[in-house]
Swiss-Prot record:
The gene is hrcA. It comes from the Bacteria. NCBIfam families: hrcA. Negative regulator of class I heat shock genes (grpE-dnaK-dnaJ and groELS operons). Prevents heat-shock induction of these operons. Belongs to the HrcA family. This is Heat-inducible transcription repressor HrcA. Pfam families: HrcA. The lineage of its organism: Bacteria, Pseudomonadati, Pseudomonadota, Alphaproteobacteria, Caulobacterales.
Amino acid sequence: MTQLFPGPIVRTPGLAELDARARDIFRRVVESYLETGEPVGSRTISKGGVALSPASIRNTMQDLAQLGLLDAPHTSAGRMPTHAGLRMFVDGFLEVGDVAEQEKRAIEARLAVKGRSFEEALAEASSILSGLAGGAGIVVTPVREGGVKHVEFVPLGGGQVLAVMVFEDGQVENRLMRQAPGVTPSALQEASNFLNARLRGRTLTEARTEMGGELDAARRQLNETAARLVEDGLAAWSGGEGDARSLIVRGQANLLADARAREDIDRVRQLFDDLSRRAQLIGLLDDVRDAEGVRIYIGAETRLFSLSGSSVIAAPYMTGRQKVLGAIGVIGPARLNYARVIPLVDYTARVLGRMMDG
């Protein structure tokens, strides 16, 4: 049995507080619910091989409900696990296996395509998880720590400018910017020269901190158009922790494929709203960066998903030297197939880390 890295600590009854009968019935209810998505009745448990009458099973299920581990939705006679119950099941009962060899080969083959950019590889990893695990695949890009080697503004026409930043580690980042009226080739060159003289060798974090006090000087040294380009360029590259990072989400349509999800459009709509809160979701995945393995959040364990009642299973991806780069995971309904999704997330994160290592 695998002990998992939990989400935030939530007070739930411990296994020691349940006798053998209660533990067995609780496990069977949760396993049946995760498989079918339907509330589980006492007769279902009785037919599953429990040597107790339906009445005795109902009494035990009632006791589990009073402990906050089971709940009865609407007027249904059946029971389903609460988020607290799912947390106890994941931490105390869940047995996690390994990823099938065929799936391992598929993950490795899709991530090993040559000529793919850094962000394309991350997007592919997110799509892989979405397809294999169901739910939406999510990945947050690393904090850029390499020093800046070169900066350039390239006119594209049609009112757009391409801001190009080349890093000392060979990575290139491009940002499309609106071209203000009156921008001339000389203003673009002037802005490029100004930034190259001051950013070369600095990380984006250092640049964001140190350049703040230099913008006033930039306005005095440059013409107004070039100064605005410098300011807009810095904002495009490093305008704060949320804006400096990319969040990639794939497979949101999977969240509508579940039969129960179709019955609860409000919950799905709330989940889509949650996914649109980019900065908060990046913050959640940044917490995963500090974890030593897979991290699981269930429902109200995060403020972000407290209303939609969704679950997040995520893991950090890192280099061979154990330098954490970012985090990748799956978001879906609370009844995700944890035994299947957890190893998929873990293996994809490890393959992605190896690929980023070159």
